[in-house]
Amino acid sequence: MARIAGVNLPSNKHVNIALTAIYGIGNSTARKICTDLDIPPFIKLKELTDGKLEELRNSIAKLLVEGDLRREVSMNIKRLIDLGSYRGLRHRRGLPVRGQRTKTNARTRKGPRKAIRAR
């Protein structure tokens, strides 16, 4: 298991798939990193040399990933809430932020249904 950006990556998977285990790196970013470092994307992580692993670590260290990215996203949401903007209000109330309908649907964001009181 290679440890990159504080994450233990599965060594039996292909490099581009293993990199997606890092928060902030998706398929397209993983492919771009592999092409920039001349790493064949379908080589297993355990087959990489120590030099290539070090290059991979240095390349990922330049990106905003894991804790730093999570912190920045939460700070952005907190900023919206503090501004009192409409988006901040929706975040605070736990409702959909991007204009989706809420009369029906939006159950994931709103949580389980509240029981209607019998009269």
UniProtKB/Swiss-Prot annotation:
Disulfide bonds: none annotated. This is Small ribosomal subunit protein uS13. HAMAP family: Ribosomal_uS13. It comes from Nitrosomonas eutropha (strain DSM 101675 / C91 / Nm57). Part of the 30S ribosomal subunit. Forms a loose heterodimer with protein S19. Forms two bridges to the 50S subunit in the 70S ribosome. One of its GO terms (biological process) is translation. Keywords: Ribonucleoprotein, Ribosomal protein, RNA-binding, rRNA-binding, tRNA-binding. One of its GO terms (cellular component) is cytosol. SUPFAM superfamilies: S13-like H2TH domain. GO terms for molecular function: rRNA binding; structural constituent of ribosome; tRNA binding. Residues 92-119 are annotated as: Disordered. Belongs to the universal ribosomal protein uS13 family. The lineage of its organism: Bacteria, Pseudomonadati, Pseudomonadota, Betaproteobacteria, Nitrosomonadales. PANTHER family: 30S RIBOSOMAL PROTEIN S13/40S RIBOSOMAL PROTEIN S18 (PTHR10871), SMALL RIBOSOMAL SUBUNIT PROTEIN US13M (PTHR10871:SF1).
